[in-house]
Amino acid sequence: MKLVADVGNTNTVFGIWNRGKILKNWRISTGRLETEDEMYVVLKQLLEAGNVDLKSIEDICVASVVPRLNSIFHYFGRKYLELDPVLVTAIDGIGVKWDVDFPSEIGADRVANVIGAHEFYGKDAIVIDTGTAITVDVLKDGAFIGGAILPGPMMAMRALFSKTAKLPEVDLFYVENHIGKNTEDNIRIGVVNGTYYALKAIISKVKEELGDKIPVIATGGNSPMFNIGNGFFDILDSDLTLKGIAVFCERVRKLEKNSAG
């Protein structure tokens, strides 16, 4: 079994990958992973609750957008499991070409999403990941050709709250009418509805350039918030990032084995 981790700015999602499937997953606050020992305590509790023996973990695979935690995962792996984790990056030789200006700048989560989309849904896809930031990743003919980044709904709302004197934090959801009658709905319409239409416009423009038949795959914790009515997501795969991390890991280990002879 593999332990896979999608480390985000706000939350981290751990998963157990075995025989081509994510068997279990857990979402925790990234702030709980400040040292290798804290990571051990958290993971031991999660795995025990899921009836998974920590000693059954044979590999660790991590996609992190929080660079300072990369070393923590290495310390944890070596100290408690005698394993060196695989860190997801945009490298050559793993089945996807990186047709962008600076592949080294692609976030690990985006690499994992592209790998996962390519492995499970084919060589053409638009992937929408709705986390702290929202990413749009475009896969065409088996190559990552670019995308877009925009603020996620929580980030946008907290920017309003922190930069103004009177605007409150509110629960976020899509509002059916588009003329708010109170401050809370005004914020929801601006933040959630506004993001919905921004995504819809971006996807429409991408399809104009590449063709209408390219599927739109959604992942990330806020994806259901934007799949309103006849939504523009063709596929909702909450495990896409974890699956992509696991596939990346398997391909890297195969490359390492082949290079070792």
From Swiss-Prot:
GO terms for cellular component: cytoplasm. Disulfide bonds: none annotated. A monovalent cation. Ammonium or potassium. ATP binds at residues 6-13, 132. It is found in: Cytoplasm. Substrate binds at residues 107-110, 183. It comes from the Bacteria. Its EC number is 2.7.1.33. Its cofactor is NH4(+); K(+). CDD domains: ASKHA_NBD_PanK-III (cd24015). It catalyses: (R)-pantothenate + ATP = (R)-4'-phosphopantothenate + ADP + H(+). GO terms for molecular function: ATP binding; metal ion binding; pantothenate kinase activity. Pathway: Cofactor biosynthesis; coenzyme A biosynthesis; CoA from (R)-pantothenate: step 1/5. One of its GO terms (biological process) is coenzyme A biosynthetic process. Keywords: ATP-binding, Coenzyme A biosynthesis, Cytoplasm, Kinase, Metal-binding, Nucleotide-binding, Potassium, Transferase. K(+) binds at residue 129. The keyword Transferase applies. The active site is at 109 (proton acceptor). Coiled coil: none annotated. Belongs to the type III pantothenate kinase family. Homodimer. Catalyzes the phosphorylation of pantothenate (Pan), the first step in CoA biosynthesis. This is Type III pantothenate kinase. It comes from Kosmotoga olearia (strain ATCC BAA-1733 / DSM 21960 / TBF 19.5.1). The gene is coaX.
